[in-house]
């Protein structure tokens, strides 16, 4: 396990209606999706325990503020298991979402 204490994240506050929505085609270029731990196991090397922040929760926020496109960044709590990232892109749809994955340093071009 770790040689440190794992910090529990605080849940996000309620989403409030903005005075103005974001301009058309606004893109969120860095956010994480945290799925249920039963489906997406956490790395034993993680530094924190996330609150559930899944695709439906993100879409509620994005639709409220006017975000149309998104780039999901692999969360460190999953190490190099990109399952949550890939499943999230599929759920958002490739017309809307892209992702930044994490791979081992010794990954080969064929594996990519």
Where are these regions (language model features)?
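Helix-coil boundary/capping segments in enzymes
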Residues: 1-112
């Amino acid at each position: 396990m770790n040689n440190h204490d794992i910090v529990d994240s605080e849940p996000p506050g309620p989403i409030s209606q903005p005075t103005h929505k974001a301009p058309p085609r606004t893109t969120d270029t860095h956010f994480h999706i945290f799925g249920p731990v039963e489906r997406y196991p956490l790395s034993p090397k993680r530094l924190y325990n996330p609150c559930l922040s899944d695709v439906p929760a993100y879409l509620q926020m994005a639709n409220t503020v006017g975000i149309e496109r998104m780039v999901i960044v692999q969360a460190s709590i999953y190490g190099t298991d990109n399952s949550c990232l890939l499943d999230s892109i599929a759920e958002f749809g490739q017309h809307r979402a892209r992702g930044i994955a994490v791979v081992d340093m010794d990954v080969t071009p064929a594996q990519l």
